[in-house]
Amino acid sequence: MFGFFFSSGQEKYSVKNILKDSGYALDSFYVGATFTYSALNKNSKIEKLFLSEFNYLTPENASKQSRIHPRPGVWDWDRHNDWIEFANKNNLTVRIHGPISPQASKWAKNDNRTQEELMLNMEEYFTELCLRINNEPSVKWMDVVNETVLRNGEWFSDKPGDSSWENPWTQIGLNSDGFPIYIIKAFEIAQKYAPNVKLVYNHNGGMERKMWEKVLETIKYLKNKGLRVDGLGWQAHLRDKNGAGLVKKDLDYLSYLIDWCHLNEMGFHVTELNYWLRDEDPNSINVLKRQSISYSNIINTLIAKRGSGLVTLNHWGLKSKKGPGSYPKNILSIYDNDLRATQAFYSIKKSLIEKNTIIRLPK
């Protein structure tokens, strides 16, 4: 089948054409990708690859607080505006990735910040973001919060210093019911100032039960307060060997999460799919096979749920690359370093064409 794609022409068997020609509901089943700002509007091979394959885009980090409003009096909309212009020009559907999240500025992470300073900065930034995207024709979804809960089910909070992965917004405090004020405030702002945009509660991790129970409890709490939560996102940074895409009980729990969303009139979004390695050889046959199986299992799970509600999948980066440190040391995606499509990408296309719903585990 892989050779079939090679010999039959990439354009005919692009993801967007497979979805259209195979009868998928194009208003409730989306497959897209993210690529780096450095490749945008430069007639680059990466940009051309994206446009040839996809019509669903998540701009990488251009809409986050750390970029747009990192400290009082400082605003920078240039990258955000460039992505919006690109999306509108090419008739793309966009999910804005600018959540209130740990990806915050050093100013926000500074240990001397007060609750009042953090709340003011958050309100200024998020209100303006919502106002700007509300009437953009390309923008369909936005991430409102991200990475709110640790794997053990506790709220993700601040750490000493300003260089760690931490969530400074939790310092604003908990309300009388024990929920972070920033989460509630973020959804209040989004509901008020972005009524035309679907609101997503994005999250990371694997399929840790305590973590997801806390997230679902929070969503129910928000809804009971009359706030709109239109979708749940899972980043899906998959691990090699024992990642969620390779473990039956985790895939079953993923299926449960999607069912829960659809029963609660919410969409389910796989928001940042890629494959993380520690010391494994990124070019080894076994690693590439496990990545392919993982990706097949994720997309097959989404295909199986397409009749009950909205599902989307976004690849976080088109090109495989080195990681930021010892873990992940390497990050695999759907094209290799030479921009050749990977086995995992062809597995996704094969599943989409066949409408495959079978879960396959490594031997």
Regions found by a protein language model. Name each.
Residues 1-11:
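Bacterial Sec-dependent N-terminal signal peptides
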Residues 11-56, 60:
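Boundary/entry segment of secreted carbohydrate-active catalytic domains
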Residues 15-26, 84-88, 187-195, 223, ...:
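Surface-exposed amphipathic alpha-helices with a cationic face
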Residues 16-21, 69, 132, 143, ...:
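Aromatic-rich peripheral "rim/lid" segments of glycoside hydrolase catalytic domains that contact
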Residues 33-45, 65-78, 149-151, 205-215, ...:
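Acidic-and-aromatic substrate-binding clefts and catalytic sites of carbohydrate-active enzymes
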Residues 37-52, 121-130, 210-222, 292-299:
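Short, acidic/polar
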Residues 52-70, 79-200, 204-206, 266, ...:
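Substrate-binding cleft and catalytic face of glycoside hydrolase catalytic domains
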Residues 55-59, 146, 194-203, 216-247, ...:
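Aromatic- and acid-rich polysaccharide-binding/catalytic face
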